[in-house]
Amino acid sequence: VVGGDECNINEHRSL
């Protein structure tokens, strides 16, 4: 992963 979708998924998971 480039580091954009993962970041988004991580943020969504945290929320």
UniProtKB/Swiss-Prot annotation:
Domain Peptidase S1: 1-15
Keyword field: Blood coagulation cascade inhibiting toxin, Hemostasis impairing toxin, Hydrolase, Protease, Secreted, Serine protease, Toxin
Molecular functions (GO terms): serine-type peptidase activity; toxin activity
Top-rank taxon: Eukaryota
GO cellular component terms listed in the entry, alphabetical order: extracellular region
The EC number(s) this enzyme carries: 3.4.21.-
Top class in the EC scheme: hydrolase
Keyword Hydrolase: yes
Subcellular location: Secreted
Keyword Protease in annotation: yes
GO annotation (BP), single: proteolysis
Quaternary structure annotation from Swiss-Prot or TrEMBL: Monomer.
Family: Belongs to the peptidase S1 family. Snake venom subfamily.
Physiological role: Snake venom serine protease that selectively cleaves the heavy chain of protein C (PROC). This activation is thrombomodulin-independent.
Stated name of the protein: Protein C activator
Native species: Gloydius halys
